[in-house]
């Protein structure tokens, strides 16, 4: 079954920045935005996996503060910002590593903050903009994933705070929080101590489903949705 519901051209004339565009959910989002007519600037340290006249690849290490600040300033013209870059790490108490926690924080929280700090004020000055952070259902907490969950919970706090700042100026900011999604991250050895859980739906979330939801939040039809944590979890967040 196709997850596509938006009409062709729904994002024509939209200039979007998508971090993590070379793989996984970020790739699916960038690909869908291109199909809907957007101009996409893909930010990733990995080689680009998309092409075409409306796709612009920017090789940036999101763990490099100076590089992120520089590219954020260069992309201040953007109408939409999607921060989809992310990694998974899992470990129980007694096996937590400070370096892992710092890496997760820099990628999920600090990089998002640096990008938004340069791009969102410019959006607000123009009176229009859309921001989506790709979070996780795990933000509510899960055994063995405390460091990862903490950074995803921080994303929700960022979004709610930022949304309150810029709502009167035509900018919406939301989190989309998937449950386990069918990407290569499911097989990441860094999550070996905390295996993915199949949601009640009976299958993992498809990257295209996440991409379609993100794309909708970038459209004019989503103008009244801001400061929200929108879960796409196949029932995983429901009471057992």
Where in this protein do the model-derived segments appear?
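Short C-terminal tail/terminal secondary-structure segment
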Residues: 2-7, 226-240
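Conserved glycine-rich cofactor-binding loop
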Residues: 22-23
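Catalytic Tyr-X3-Lys loop
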Residues: 87, 94-114, 132, 155
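Conserved mid-core segment of classical short-chain dehydrogenase/reductases
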Residues: 88-102, 144-147, 185-189
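Alpha-helical segment proximal to the catalytic Tyr-Lys
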Residues: 121, 164-165, 223
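Catalytic loop of short-chain dehydrogenase/reductase
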Residues: 130-154, 159-168, 180
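Short, small/polar-rich loop/turn modules that mediate ligand/substrate recognition or access, typified
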Residues: 167, 172, 225-227
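A conserved structural motif in NAD(P)-dependent oxidoreductases
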Residues: 199-210
């Amino acid at each position: 079954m196709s997850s596509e519901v938006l009409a062709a051209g729904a994002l024509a004339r939209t200039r979007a920045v998508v971090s993590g565009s070379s793989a996984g959910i970020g790739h699916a989002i960038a690909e869908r935005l291109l199909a809907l007519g957007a101009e996409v600037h893909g930010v990733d340290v990995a080689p680009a996996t998309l092409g075409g006249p409306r796709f612009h690849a920017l090789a940036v290490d999101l763990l490099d503060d100076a590089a992120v600040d520089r590219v954020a300033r260069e992309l201040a013209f953007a109408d939409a910002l999607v921060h989809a870059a992310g990694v998974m790490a899992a470990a129980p108490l007694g096996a937590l590593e400070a370096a892992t926690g710092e890496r997760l924080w820099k990628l999920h929280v600090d990089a998002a903050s640096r990008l938004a700090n340069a791009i969102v004020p410019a959006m607000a000055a123009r009176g229009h903009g859309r921001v989506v952070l790709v979070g996780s259902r795990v933000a509510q907490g899960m055994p063995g994933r405390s460091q990862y969950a903490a950074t995803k919970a921080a994303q929700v706090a960022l979004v709610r705070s930022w949304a309150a700042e810029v709502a009167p100026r035509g900018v919406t900011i939301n989190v989309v929080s998937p449950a386990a999604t069918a990407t290569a991250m499911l097989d990441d050895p860094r999550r070996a101590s905390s295996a993915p859980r199949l949601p009640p739906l009976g299958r993992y979330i498809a990257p295209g489903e996440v991409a379609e939801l993100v794309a909708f939040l970038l459209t004019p039809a989503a103008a009244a949705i801001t400061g929200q944590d929108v879960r796409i979890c196949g029932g995983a967040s429901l009471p057992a």
